UniProtKB/Swiss-Prot annotation:
Subunit structure: Interacts with CSM1.
UniProt cross-references to PANTHER family, sorted A to Z: NUCLEAR RIM PROTEIN 1
Protein task: Member of a perinuclear network that controls recombination at multiple loci to maintain genome stability. Required for rDNA repeat stability.
The protein's name: Nuclear rim protein 1
InterPro entries the UniProt entry points to: Nur1/Mug154
GO cellular component labels: nuclear membrane
Keywords from the named record: Membrane, Nucleus, Phosphoprotein, Transmembrane, Transmembrane helix
Bias (Polar residues) ranges: 430-440
Region (Disordered): 416-458
Species this protein is from: Saccharomyces cerevisiae (strain YJM789)
Any single GO BP term: regulation of exit from mitosis
Positions of transmembrane segments: 145-165, 252-272
Amino acid sequence: MGSNDLINEAYDDSEVVGEERESKSAWMKRWYQLLTSPLDLQLVINEKLEMINWDAYAKSLAKPLGNFLTILFFIIRLLQDNLIKPNYYKLNVKSGAFDLSKSNKLKEFDYLWEISSSFQNSNQFYAFQSWYFVTLRFLNNLFRFTIFILLSLNLYVSCKFMFGYFKTYNLFHLKKEFNSPNLTKHNLKDLSKEYYEDIYKQSLWSMLKHFFRGSRDDGPHVNQNEVEIFFQLRKWIPTNFMINLFVSFSPTAIVFLSFSDVSFTSAIAIVFHQYILDYIITKRFQRSVDDDLILSSAALQEYEDKHIMARINQCSNIDTLSSAMGTRSKTPRIFTTHSLCGEEIREVYNYEKREFEALPKMTESVPGSRETRIKDYGGISQVSDNQSHPIGFHYSPRMSPYYRDKVLDNNLAQSSSNENLEKGGAFLPNQDQNRPSKSLSPLRKTPLSARQKRFEGSEFNVLNKNDINSILRSPKKKKNYHKR
């Protein structure tokens, strides 16, 4: 064996020793962390428990476990009332109550000592000397301990079921205050509060009160007419696993067995009680909650199909695209509902009042179909009073009364455009005088001099003449005064 082999063996032994030392030090560190910070272990265990889907084991684990605990409690109470209770006196008698061998007076007299010794040797019926009563005494202690564990477990399950599953919802769009003890009104400023910093500044009693009672302390009074408010709903939502465990390991059955003389006929009442409770809660009430969820989902899907999807489909997106004649003016979103009599009701949401307002039947502005709008863009749409104007052309709000009053004169001027050409009136620039254009409005076909005369006698003569001329001469008037 060479020197290199010896060096390699020594090197290998050092690695093994180092690994053993590292493993020992790692175990020492783990034990030290476990002893110094046991809350870390509790945190790890809670994380593992929370990651388990307990609702999947509601039927396979919770219900059989609860029934087993109830049957175990029934058997223990049955043995206590029929086996331990008749021998209660013999089990609780003191072993040294009639021990004559411990009497100093009897030891002074020899004949009395002989009588007492012969009496004790002939009577071996004391409970402490019999193996039967020793076994019963052991069973009595075991039954008491088991009853205490089962009562504590049932109390924990009941409290966890009734007070341990609450979720808080902030309702910002609820307007009507319902008569529910779980619904409270709060101010919007409460959302920006730093609760724990405010609590730490208070007294020790306030801190203990908060951590034991949670955030259920009564807050400041909120004005009923205040606008910046929201409702907070604290809803009780137990899990399916806990519901089945509570029903199968019911506190009513445990209380009944604890305060009554249990016999074999009591099993009939327990079986009937378990069946009725399971039928009412799991097969009726819980399924009713699931049916309400189905109805809510169906109503939400119907609203989405009729109101939401109808407004974001492909045709609606095409209608909102800009065209050469400009986009149409937007109308407020109209929601269609029906009354109890079957009448159609159209409502629009008022953002200032924050409520829906019903639209009159004669003044509803429902946008037309796409084909109708395309036809209107190509020509002149007819309006009431036998007036016409090009669709897509929007006047200025200040000038609209004047054009509305003079629209009849413009129609007459449109019919006699050839006569205006013979009069030698000035026309707008970029206008083909030989062939009238389709896109020209009736006002642009009227001579400039005639329009200026109408302005001088109207209520708009206070305007600057340069502004009026620029408005009338501008070829991009439609673009500048297009209502967006």
